[in-house]
Amino acid sequence: MFLVYEMEYLHPVNDKTSIQMIPFSSKYQEEYKRIYNKCYHEMRQALKIEPVDYIQDDSFFESCMDKVFLFVSGEEIIGSVKIKDNEIDDLIVNAKYQSQGYGKQILLWALENIKSEKIILHVAEWNKKAIELYRKNGFEIVNTISINYEQDYKEVQ
């Protein structure tokens, strides 16, 4: 069991981003898979979520990838984010570019590109670094959700 915070964008920030993001393209599929799995590996391992490497095969890429945007330099993915209606999801930064401000820039890009009054995201309590980023950029915890991964996962199937 672990906790997930629902956070809402309640305190708008005036910061703007200068980065440009592009829609996901299949030419980045293998690199995205590697970066995504690496970004979530430690958390999924600590929370005992199986499989630890979430993207196992190409079936992951069959849905919702039209909502994923990449920040690319040259041919390398620096980071990405998924925008689902009014929700920011799967904001990741390539490990070699972490702690350089790219997470904030990707978050600001997402905020500028969501056309909704209410913007939310969900983050595991374990992910202190992400929670701090979100708080510094106008998000506040509005709900705490308890996840029993094994039970909830079985109920979904």
Name every feature range the model reports, one short phrase each.
Residues 20-34:
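A short beta-loop-alpha structural element at the N-terminal edge
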Residues 1-18:
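Acyl-donor-binding surface of acyltransferase catalytic domains
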Residues 1, 104, 126-144:
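Conserved active-site alpha-helix within GNAT-family acetyltransferase domains
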Residues 70, 75-92:
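Conserved beta-strand in the GNAT
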Residues 37-59:
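Conserved GNAT-fold acetyl-CoA-binding loop/helix
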Residues 97, 101-109:
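Conserved acetyl-CoA pyrophosphate-binding loop and the N-cap/start of the following alpha-helix
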Residues 58-70, 87:
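A short helix-loop-beta-strand connector motif used in the catalytic cores of GNAT acetyltransferases and
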Residues 121-131, 147-156:
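Conserved beta-strand-loop-alpha-helix junction that forms the acyl-donor binding cleft
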